Amino acid sequence: MGIKGLKPLLRSYGVHEYTVPLSQMSGKTIAVDGTFLLHKYKNCHSVPWHYLTLYTLSNLRLRNVKVLFIFDGMSPPEKSREKSNRRCRKQALMEKGTLVKAQLEVWKKDGGEQAPELAAVSERLVKTRGLDPSLTDPETVQVLTDYVDNMSRDTRVTSDDYELMRRSLDAFGFPYADAPDEAELCCVRVVQMGIADAPMTIDSDALACGALHGVDVVYTDLHGETLTAMSTSKSKEALGLNGEQFMDLCVMCGTDFNQRVHKLGPVTALKLIKAHGSIENIPSAAPSMSCLEAVRTREILSGGDMESRRKDYEAMVQKPVSAELIRSVFPPEFLDKLLHENWQLRDAMKRMAPEAFEKCKRK
């Protein structure tokens, strides 16, 4: 998702993601890639995605963080190949999960040697989670069962999911809009226009766009009360590039909208850009750059012209929390769970929307 191999390259130059408390953005506005957030929560295996939404929105209100949620609009045709590849990978994972789940049931019933696909999953869990290699411990078997169940689970985002997400935002008074194209690029441009203070998206396309437009920090994740951030200014400084050169490096790495040059990785791409200044200046004796579609890919990664929509985005203001909508959108068990998990959220939500929680169980 995003620029291929960019973050490992940056890490090799000492540029790492770092964390900041969410409270640091109190009173400020974040332009959030709502599509990224929804996909992230749908792929969470341990907690229902709609509860994660409730928790996050409550936390944002508690910390007095203003948010503009922006969802993907019409993707450019150049992204069709990447979208098709993602669908195929998702379908293949679900099919493998279904197969391994059936093999697990046979193994739990009959014992003996595991089928090859199940054995590969078991071996991976033994290495990554420190499970008992004998796989005889009940807790170990349960971990394996849960993992296999998640492999076969359909985590594709539906139109109903988007509708529920938007209703959830309405309940908490957060404004939202559809981007003219890619949400992550729109988030950066909204910041560049001075309408928001920082963008948030996991998609590294935003780093290319931010580096070009002078947006110094891109938040790449939100986990509880902590934001993860990446500095575009430090990234450019560490690599010795300006914004236009950083953009060309990203184009050469390969993106969701183009293919990189065969057998030309990020390290070589950086050397070529530093030596010649731009893709167009790379000598013809070097590998052909035609597959990069550099002009069009730069145009996409730069983000669309947002000035025509300035008034629409400036009119996106935060509204009060609606207790009535919260009760209609979130099931009672989610509201009860929220109140009893975090005393700060409990006190804050009872102040902002006491009627929404009046029927929750008391402890």
UniProtKB/Swiss-Prot annotation:
Subcellular localization, as worded in the UniProt entry: Host nucleus
Protein EC: 3.1.-.-
Required cofactor(s): Mg(2+)
The keyword Magnesium is annotated on this UniProt entry: yes
Pfam families: XPG_I (PF00867), XPG_N (PF00752)
GO MF annotation list: 5'-3' exonuclease activity; 5'-flap endonuclease activity; DNA binding; metal ion binding
CDD domains on file: H3TH_FEN1-XPG-like (cd09897)
Domain of life: Viruses
SUPFAM superfamilies documented for this protein: 5' to 3' exonuclease, C-terminal subdomain, PIN domain-like
Cofactor stoichiometry and binding remark: Binds 2 magnesium ions per subunit.
Key words, A-Z: Endonuclease, Host nucleus, Hydrolase, Magnesium, Metal-binding, Nuclease
Gene3D superfamilies named among the record's database cross-references: 5' to 3' exonuclease, C-terminal subdomain (1.10.150.20), 5'-nuclease (3.40.50.1010)
GO cellular component term, pick one: host cell nucleus
Top-level EC class as recorded in UniProt: hydrolase
Role noted for this protein: Probable endonuclease.
Similarity comment: Belongs to the XPG/RAD2 endonuclease family.
Family matches, as PANTHER family: FLAP ENDONUCLEASE FAMILY MEMBER, XP-G FAMILY NUCLEASE
Protein name per its UniProtKB record: Putative RAD2-like endonuclease 095R
